């Protein structure tokens, strides 16, 4: 079996479906909304796990609602998080993505949060060295 390891930012996306983009300083009801894990690393790891690879995320997440969502989402798809640091007192990387039905387009507004950069420990280094694929 192939092993994929991902390092980097993972994002809690809120996808908001709207019929069209609203004018500035107005209100509009969304047609629907949902939350999903996002970012290139998270998306790639989930895809690898769905295809049967052993997948693992190495990174830093917050213990806030966004970080908790991402941990649960990874577990749901079989992505290991044993080497993920979960820290208190920080904000998760989040994004709000508006999907316009009329324009068939998307607009993303994001908050990178304030998590510190990852400092690799020996276990994390070992997992990276043992990977067949690094994302």
Q: How does the language model describe each region?
A:
Residues 65-77, 97-99:
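Active-site-proximal loop->helix
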Residues 1-60, 65-69:
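Glycine-rich phosphate/adenosyl-contacting loop at the front of the ribokinase-like
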Residues 36-43, 88-91, 115-120:
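Short secondary-structure boundary/capping elements
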Residues 56-59, 83, 133-135:
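Short catalytic-loop micro-motif centered on adjacent basic/acidic residues
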Residues 73-90:
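A glycine-rich helix N-cap at a beta->alpha junction
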Residues 86-87, 97-135:
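Conserved phosphate-binding/catalytic loop of the ribokinase/pfkB sugar-kinase fold
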């Amino acid at each position: 079996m192939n092993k994929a390891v991902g390092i980097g930012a993972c994002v809690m996306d809120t996808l908001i479906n709207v019929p069209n983009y609203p004018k500035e300083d107005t209100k509009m009801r969304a047609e629907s909304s949902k939350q999903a894990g996002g970012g290139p690393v998270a998306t790639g790891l989930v895809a690898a796990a769905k295809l049967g690879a052993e997948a693992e995320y190495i990174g830093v997440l917050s213990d806030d609602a966004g970080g908790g969502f991402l941990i649960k989402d990874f577990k749901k798809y079989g992505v290991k998080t044993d080497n993920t640091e979960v820290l208190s007192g920080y904000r998760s990387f989040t994004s709000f993505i508006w999907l316009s039905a009329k324009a068939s387009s998307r607009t993303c507004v994001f908050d990178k949060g304030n998590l510190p950069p990852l400092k690799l420990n020996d276990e994390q280094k070992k997992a990276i060295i043992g990977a067949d694929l690094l994302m």
